[in-house]
A protein has these predicted regions:
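Surface-exposed loop/turn segments flanking beta-strands in extracellular/periplasmic regions
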Residues: 3-17, 43-52, 103-147, 195-200, ...
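Signature of Gram-negative outer-membrane beta-barrel scaffolds
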Residues: 61, 65, 87-224, 351, ...
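Repeated loop/turn-to-beta-strand initiation elements of outer-membrane beta-barrel proteins
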Residues: 85-88, 171-174, 226-229, 277-280, ...
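Conserved small/polar residues in nucleotide/adenosyl-binding loops
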Residues: 419-421
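Gram-negative outer-membrane beta-barrel transporters
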Residues: 168-171, 285-288, 309-414
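Transmembrane beta-barrel strands of outer-membrane/channel proteins
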Residues: 1, 90-96, 176-182, 231-235, ...
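Outer-membrane beta-barrel domain signature, strongest for Gram-negative TonB-dependent receptors
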Residues: 1-99, 103, 279-283
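Surface-exposed extracellular loop regions of Gram-negative outer-membrane beta-barrel proteins
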Residues: 132, 136-141, 184-196, 207, ...
Length: 422
């Protein structure tokens, strides 16, 4: 705050942001000339700015965003062979995950301290007098190695019980499995944020409860030694990630409204052919998800305020085909080929509620984000792979690989697809 952005690609430093033609041309020339004072991080300037700070505290600093995760799991399993062909497996499990998140000062860049406040609120006409990140330690002096900004725990408790039944004959294999469980998630804040004083930020939040499950069935048949066909279907639900369950995990105990499990339904058909020097496998698949949840933080230009957006009812449809082949070219030479083609798209229009980040005021409730039929981003929908391996004597080898991806789309924005209702 109260200093130029350290990011060279900050949008205000880009030529396209400049409205004055002369300034725009100057910025274009700077970037074309690759002037490192503008195109790279200027560390010397950060130290100079810190030396000239009015109150002696750091203006620029380096921080670590620390995540400390501890997992504990207990598992008990049993197996009963009812007959030569029929096997029953069963078990129970319990798990607990404790995750601690906080910011830690790494480097004050020439200064000796930093005051722990929310500096982005200083010029706010409404909340400019609520700057404390921790009311229990107001205006805390932060030195290198100290925690500041936010500090909270996220705990997930899970328990489940399940079983499976497997039947094997000469050519036929059938398998069915089921698991049901219960899960709870809660946040525990170690700082009392002035914006959300009391138990709105400090201490334990309300626990959120879920009932995840998994049902899976498969059947496979070997027509001969070389030909095998297998079909699998499944249905499951999972507990959402903690980031998608609270409006702002860093300093707010408030959960989203009506949290629910994400549902997933799918089917696969696999064919395998095994020859003397070739092994080939082809797969057809379809996966449908529903009731997904996401929380995003952004500056809403429509409402001119920093906002927390909670989206519910996110659903996707993915289907396609995959094929792999392992070819033995010679005694020491192997060739691996793989390809996939699919269509991955959003199938539902999520329902979105927008909150003001500073006070959780509802800015827009149950608006529709028209993402249905948009392509899922960040995942290639066409892929190809080839790998050549040579295995030499005495354990050494040489490997060469090539890969290609296509039809990769930018992830659609829940915000840009949003229709505001006023």
């Amino acid at each position: 705050y109260d200093a130029p952005s350290p990011m060279p690609d900050y949008y205000r430093w880009m030529p396209g942001y400049q409205t004055d033609p002369v300034t725009r041309l100057e910025m274009e020339n700077i970037w074309r000339a690759n002037d490192v004072r503008y195109t790279q991080i200027d560390w010397d300037e950060f130290y100079r700015q810190n030396r000239n700070s009015k109150d002696g505290s750091a203006t620029y600093l380096m921080e670590d965003r620390v995540e400390r995760i501890a997992n504990m799991q207990l598992l008990a399993e049993g197996i009963t062979r009812i007959s030569e062909r029929l096997t029953v497996r069963y078990g129970i499990r319990a798990a607990r995950t404790d995750s601690r998140f906080y910011k830690q000062m790494r480097d004050l860049m020439g200064r000796s301290y930093f005051v722990d406040r929310d500096y982005y609120l200083i010029d706010d006409g409404v909340y400019g007098n609520k700057l404390q990140n921790d009311l229990r330690h107001p205006d805390r002096i932060i030195r290198e190695g100290d925690r500041f900004g936010y500090d909270y725990d996220l705990r997930r408790n899970e328990i489940g019980a399940g079983g499976s039944l497997e039947y094997r004959a000469d050519r036929l294999r059938a398998f069915i499995a089921a698991e049901v469980g219960a899960a709870s998630v809660f946040r525990r804040g170690h700082y009392e944020k002035e914006l959300f004083a009391g138990n709105k930020s400090f201490g334990k939040s309300r626990a959120l409860h879920f009932a995840p499950y998994l049902f899976r069935a498969s059947a496979g048949y070997s027509f001969s030694v070389r030909h095998h066909l297998e079909m699998t279907v499944y249905a499951s639900s999972r507990t959402p990630d903690g980031d998608d369950l609270f409006l702002n995990l860093e300093y707010n105990n408030r959960p989203v409204e009506d949290p629910t499990e994400e549902k997933r339904y799918g089917a696969e058909l696999n064919y395998t052919w095994s020859g003397r020097n070739v092994r080939f496998r082809a797969t057809l698949f379809v996966v449908r998800t529903a009731d997904g949840m996401q929380v995003r933080h952004y500056y809403d230009d429509f409402y001119a305020t920093y906002s927390d957006m909670a989206a519910a009812g996110i659903g996707t449809l993915r289907y396609g085909a995959e094929a792999t082949a392992l070819i033995r070219l010679a005694y020491r030479w192997n060739l691996t080929l793989a390809a996939s083609a699919g269509r991955y798209r959003y199938a539902d229009n999520p329902v979105v509620t927008v909150y003001a980040d500073a006070n959780n005021e509802v800015l827009d409730r149950n608006a529709t984000s028209y993402m249905g039929d948009c392509s899922v981003g960040n995942t290639p929908q066409l892929t190809g792979f080839a790998g050549l391996n040579y295995y030499g004597p005495k354990g050494w080898g040489v490997q060469a690989e090539a890969a290609w991806t296509g039809n990769r789309f930018v992830e659609p924005s829940l915000v840009l697809s949003l229709i505001h209702i006023s």
